[in-house]
C-alpha cells in the first residue's frame, strides 16, 4: 500500500506493485506540471502490459488496444473517431420510444435509466469503464472505426479550453465552445461563468441536434430537439480538474472507497487528511458545461462525455496498477448514496447495459487487460 510523507515542497511516495515497481519521490512542481502523472502513468502502463504478456489466451499482449490522449492521436484517428460518432447519430434507436431517434440517443437513455445505480455507489467507476468500452464496440461494429479510443487530460487545457485540440472547432476536434451568452451563470456553484453558454458554432458538431432531455422536463424522454450548447469554463478546470487535482487523487487515496468518493466530490478526506473539493468527475463535466453537458442524467449525449470519462477511468487504471494485488476491490452499495437502502455490492453482481450490450458482472470490468472482455491500456500523454 502507499505511504506518504509530505512537506511544503516535496511529496515522497513509496510503494510496491505486484511486480515490484517503486513510485518515485515527486516535488510539488512535478505534480503541478504533470511530470508526476506521466511517471505514474508509465508505471501503470508497464504493470498492466506485464500481466498481458503472461496471458496465453484472451487479452494477450499482441491484442491490447492502446488508448491515447486526444492530442497524441493521429489526425486520421481524430477524424475517424469523430466521423464514427457522427455515424452513430444516423443509426436508428433500439429503444422504440418516441423521443430517442438514434443509436447515439440510446446512450443518453441508458445513462438516464442507470444514473441512480451507477453514481455515488460501488459501481460508479467500473460501470462507466464498461460504458465507454461498449461505445468503442459500437463505433467499430456499426461505423467501421477501429482506431484509437481517446481520453482527455483536462489539466493540459485548464486556462485555455477554447484552444484545446478537443474543443477548438477545427476539423479534427469535437466542435467548439458555445456562442457567448451575456450575464449567464456557471452551471456549478463556486465558479465564475464560462466563456460560452449558447449553441456550438464551429466544427464537426455545430449542427448537432440533441433529441431528448433535459432531466427537469415534464417528460425527459420525449422528443425535444434543440442545439448542442457548451460553456467552456477555465475557472472550473483550474479549481477541480487540474493536473494537481488528478495527481493528488491518485496519490492520496489508499482505498477504493476514498478514491471513488474523492473523485465525485463527496467531502471525504484522503491520506493525511487531504481534501478534494468538488472532485475531478464534476470538474471535467463542468469544464465543458452546457446542454446536455451539465445534465446529470443526459450528459452522455455530449460528445465530450466519453474522452472525459476515459480520463477518469485512466486515473482509476493508474491507481489500481500502482498496487494491483490490493486494488481489485469495490466499496459501497448498488444505489446512489444508498437511497433506497440496498446491500453492499459484491463482485458477482451484474451491471446493466441492455439493450446496448449484454449485462456483465462487476468483476468482469475490474481489469482493463482481463480479457473478459476488456483488453486495453492507457498510454501516458
Describe every region a protein language model picked out.
Residues 21-381:
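C-terminal accessory segments of proteins
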Amino acid at each position: 500500500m502507499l505511504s506518504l510523507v509530505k512537506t511544503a515542497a516535496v511529496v515522497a511516495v513509496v510503494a510496491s506493485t505486484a511486480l515490484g515497481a517503486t513510485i518515485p519521490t515527486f516535488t510539488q512542481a512535478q505534480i503541478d506540471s504533470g511530470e508526476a502523472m506521466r511517471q505514474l502513468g508509465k508505471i501503470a502502463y508497464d504493470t498492466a502490459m506485464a500481466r498481458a504478456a503472461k496471458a496465453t489466451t484472451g487479452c494477450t499482449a499482441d491484442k491490447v488496444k492502446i488508448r491515447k490522449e486526444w492530442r497524441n492521436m493521429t489526425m486520421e484517428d481524430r477524424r475517424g473517431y469523430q466521423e464514427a460518432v457522427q455515424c452513430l447519430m444516423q443509426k436508428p434507436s433500439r429503444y422504440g420510444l418516441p423521443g430517442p431517434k438514434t443509436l447515439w440517443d440510446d446512450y443518453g437513455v441508458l445513462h438516464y435509466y442507470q444514473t441512480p445505480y451507477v453514481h455515488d455507489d460501488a459501481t460508479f467507476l467500473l460501470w462507466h469503464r464498461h460504458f465507454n468500452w461498449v461505445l468503442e464496440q459500437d463505433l467499430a461494429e456499426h461505423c467501421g472505426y477501429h482506431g484509437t479510443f481517446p481520453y482527455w487530460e483536462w489539466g493540459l487545457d485548464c486556462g485555455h479550453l477554447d484552444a484545446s485540440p478537443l474543443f477548438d472547432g477545427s476539423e479534427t476536434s469535437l466542435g467548439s465552445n458555445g456562442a457567448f451568452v451575456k450575464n449567464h451563470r456557471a452551471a456549478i456553484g463556486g465558479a465564475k461563468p464560462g466563456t460560452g453558454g449558447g449553441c456550438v458554432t464551429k466544427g464537426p458538431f455545430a449542427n448537432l441536434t440533441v433529441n431528448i432531455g433535459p432531466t427537469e422536463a415534464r417528460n425527459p424522454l420525449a422528443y425535444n430537439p434543440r442545439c448542442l450548447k457548451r460553456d467552456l469554463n477555465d475557472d472550473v478546470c483550474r479549481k477541480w480538474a487540474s493536473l494537481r487535482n488528478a495527481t493528488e487523487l491518485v496519490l492520496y487515496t489508499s482505498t477504493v472507497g476514498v478514491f471513488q468518493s474523492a473523485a465525485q466530490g463527496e467531502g471525504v478526506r484522503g491520506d493525511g487528511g487531504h481534501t478534494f473539493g468538488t472532485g475531478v468527475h464534476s470538474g471535467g463535466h463542468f469544464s465543458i458545461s452546457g446542454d446536455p453537458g451539465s445534465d446529470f442524467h443526459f450528459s452522455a449525449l455530449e460528445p465530450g462525455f466519453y474522452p472525459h470519462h476515459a480520463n477518469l477511468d485512466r486515473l482509476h487504471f493508474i491507481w489500481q496498477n500502482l498496487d494491483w494485488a490490493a486494488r481489485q476491490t469495490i466499496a459501497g452499495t448498488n444505489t446512489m448514496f444508498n437511497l433506497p437502502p440496498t446491500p453492499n455490492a459484491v463482485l458477482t453482481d451484474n451491471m446493466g447495459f441492455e439493450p446496448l450490450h449484454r449485462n456483465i458482472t462487476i468483476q468482469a470490468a475490474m481489469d482493463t487487460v482481463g480479457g473478459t472482455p476488456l483488453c486495453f491500456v492507457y498510454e501516458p500523454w
